[in-house]
Amino acid sequence: MSRRALLRDGMLASGLMLGAPLLAACGKGNTAGPAKAGAMGAGSLRLLWVENVEFAGSYIADTNGYYKAEGFSSFTLISGGPTATPVETDLVAGKALFGISTPDLVASAVVRGGAGIKIIGAQFQKTPFALVSMADKPITTPQDMIGKKIGVQAISEPVWAAFLKANHINPNSVTKVPVQFDPLPLTTGVVDGWVGYITDEPIVLRSKGFKVVTFLFADHGYPLVGDAYVVSDKTIKEHRDAVKAFLHAQIRGWKEALADPALGARLAVEKYGKNLGLNVAVQTQESKTQNTLVLTDDTKKNGLFTMTPELIAENIAALKLGGINMTAGQIFDLSLLTEVYQENPSLV
C-alpha cells in the first residue's frame, strides 16, 4: 500500500482546517532548570504512518518515560495510516501538538493551503526515496535509467518529475510504467527499476530472497530531508518550552534507537504495532537502514535532527524543482533545536 498516496490524497480530500484551537495546554515562556512534573500539560505526536519501527525513537521515549521527565503530564502517540487525516490538518486543527511529515507535504500545506506550521527538525537527513533494481540488471546511477522501464506509483510522479529535472534527464528518454503498491513487477521483469523507499521495498524483497540494488534520490540531486518534526506557529509562539521539551525527549529516545536498532523493532512488533502483523527481523533491518539516514557526519557534529544552512538551502531548491517556490523562513525554524543543544551540550 502506498503511504504517500494515502497521505497526499488525504490532504487533498480533507483540506486544511485553519484557526481551530490548540488541543493541549502547555507551559508558556522560558523556564530554568528541570521541568516540574506535568508543567507542560498533555502532549501528543501525530505519526506520519502506522506504528512500525520508523518511529523507534518515539517509542523508546514513551516507554522510558522521557516525555514525562521533560514535564508532560501525559503523552500520546497518534497513529497515521490509510484512514488518517493529513498530519498538517491535525496540527492546525489542534488535534495533535506535534507531527511528523515531509518537506514537500508541509510546503504544499503552507503555500497552497495557508497552514501556519514550521519544520523544527529532521529525523532523516535524507529522504528515503530510492531507485530499486534487480542485482542481475542493476541501475546504479540516474543516467542508467535512460532507455529503461521504471515503475512509478501515481502519487510519486511529482517527486519522479523533480528527480529527472534535477538530473537533467529528458522524461521521454525513460519509459515510466504506472504501477500499484506491490513491487512484484520488478521481480518479474515487467519493469527494470522501481521508485520506492530505501526502508521499505528493498528490505521486503531481500527478506523474500530477491537480490536488489538501490540508490538514494538524496545522493543524486534531490536532497530533501525526511520525517520532519512539524509544529504550528501558534505552538512555537505560545508554548516554546513545550516544543523544546519534546525535542529533548525525542533526542534521548533516538540516541537509544541508534545504539540498539533491535530495541525499537521489538517495541514496534510487540507493543505499538502489535496488531499490524509486523516481522521482527524485517523491522530490525529497517531500523538499521533508517539509522543511516538519521546519523550523518553533520548530525554527529551538530546533534540529531539538526539541519545545516546548506542542507536547508538544498531543500528549498529541491522544492522549487517540484514547483513549490518559497523561502526557508516560510517552512523552517531550527532555532528551538539550537536552543536545546545550547542549553544541553551533552546531548550532541
Regions of interest found by a model, annotated:
Residues 1-17, 21:
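N-terminal secretory signal peptides and thylakoid transit peptides that target proteins
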Residues 17, 33-179, 184-188, 192-196, ...:
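Short, glycine-/small- and polar/acidic-enriched structural segments
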Residues 27-29:
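Bacterial signal peptide processing site
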Residues 137, 182-277:
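Pocket-lining segment of extracytoplasmic ligand-binding domains
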Residues 239-322:
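Secondary-structure end/capping motifs
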Residues 309-348:
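Conserved C-terminal helix/tail region of periplasmic/extracytoplasmic solute-binding proteins
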